[in-house]
C-alpha cells in the first residue's frame, strides 16, 4: 500500500473531519440516528469563494493563531488554536459592525473555536451560521444590553417572491455544530398575532445543529419564538418569551434554570415538541425553571404523535390550564405521547386536573430527565 506524502495527509485529515462533523444528510448523536425531514431546506454556504478551502483556512489560522480561548472540551480545541473577533456599532472600536460580517470573514470550513464578542447595542440584522462553520461562540455584554433582531414571518416573501416559511423566518439561525451563545438577546420584532392568524409564525432563534449551548440568553418573540429544531442542546439561565408554541421542534434539549414567560392575549401553549417516532430519542426537559405570564396556557401541544416533554422542580404560575396538555385534535396521540411532571410547585402545578394521559412521574421515571446525561452533556459541555 503506497504511503501518503506530506501534502496528501493534511487533505485527508480535513476531509475526514468534514465527514464526521458536517454531514448534511443526517443528524446523529450517541443515542440514535435521525434522518433529516424531506422538506427541510439545506442552507447553502458562501458560493463566491475561489480559494482552496484548506489554503484559506490555514492562512486565517496563521493570522490569528496566537490568541487563546476555550469553551468546549480542550481535546477538540487542541486541533487548532482559537481566537477572538469583536463586533461594535462604531467601526473604529471593533473588527466589524455587523455580526454576519464577522461570521462571513471565517474560512469556508472552520474547526477553530472562534469567540465573537458583540458589544452593547441593538444589531438589526438577519444572521445565519452556515453548516461548515463549526465552533463559533457569540458573546454579548449582557442579554439586556446586546440584542440581534429582525422581523420576518412565515409569510414574508423570499428572493423569488414566495413565502419563506417558518424555517427561514428566524432572526438568528444556527446550522453548525458546537455553537455557544452567552449573554445576548435574539429577538423577532413581529407583534403578537391575532387568534387564528395565518402565516404569522415568527422565529427569533432556530437551532438546527448538534451540540449547541446557550447561557444567560433571551429569546423574544410571539408565535414560534424558539425553533429548537434538531440536535442536542443545552439552555442554562435563559429567558424565553412568546405566545403560542413558542418552544417547538424535534431536538433533544435540556432547559435548566430558565424563565419561560407567556405574552398570550387569550390561549397559548409553551411547547410543541415534534417527536414523530418511538425510535427518535428527542424531547424537551425543563428542570428548575419558572413559567409565568398572561393569558391561559397549555404546557404543551402534541405537534408530533410521539411528543415528549417533562417539567421537573418547576414553578408554574396560575396561568396553566388545569388540563395541562392538548392532543393537537388527534385522540390517537394520547396513547403515544410522553408528558410528565415531577415535583413542580405553584398554583399552575396542581396535578389534580391534568389529562389522564399525562404522568406524574416517580423518582425512577424522572431520573433520566434531570441532568446533563439527558443530552449526553458530559461528552461535549464544559461548564
From Swiss-Prot:
It comes from the Eukaryota. Pathway: Glycan metabolism; pectin degradation; 2-dehydro-3-deoxy-D-gluconate from pectin: step 1/5. Gene3D superfamilies: Single-stranded right-handed beta-helix, Pectin lyase-like. Expressed in siliques. The active site is at residues 224, 245. Residues 1-28 form the signal peptide. The record marks 223 as: Transition state stabilizer. Its EC number is 3.1.1.11. It is found in: Secreted, Cell wall. GO terms for biological process: cell wall modification; pectin catabolic process. It catalyses: [(1->4)-alpha-D-galacturonosyl methyl ester](n) + n H2O = [(1->4)-alpha-D-galacturonosyl](n) + n methanol + n H(+). GO terms for molecular function: pectinesterase activity. Keywords: Aspartyl esterase, Cell wall, Cell wall biogenesis/degradation, Glycoprotein, Hydrolase, Secreted, Signal. Substrate binds at residues 166, 201, 301, 303. InterPro entries: Pectin_lyas_fold, Pectin_lyase_fold/virulence, Pectinesterase_Asp_AS, Pectinesterase_cat. Glycans are attached at residues 44, 183. One of its GO terms (cellular component) is cytoplasm. Its main location: secreted. Belongs to the pectinesterase family. Acts in the modification of cell walls via demethylesterification of cell wall pectin. PANTHER family: ACYL-COA THIOESTER HYDROLASE YBHC-RELATED, PECTINESTERASE 53-RELATED. This is Probable pectinesterase 53. It comes from Arabidopsis thaliana (Mouse-ear cress).
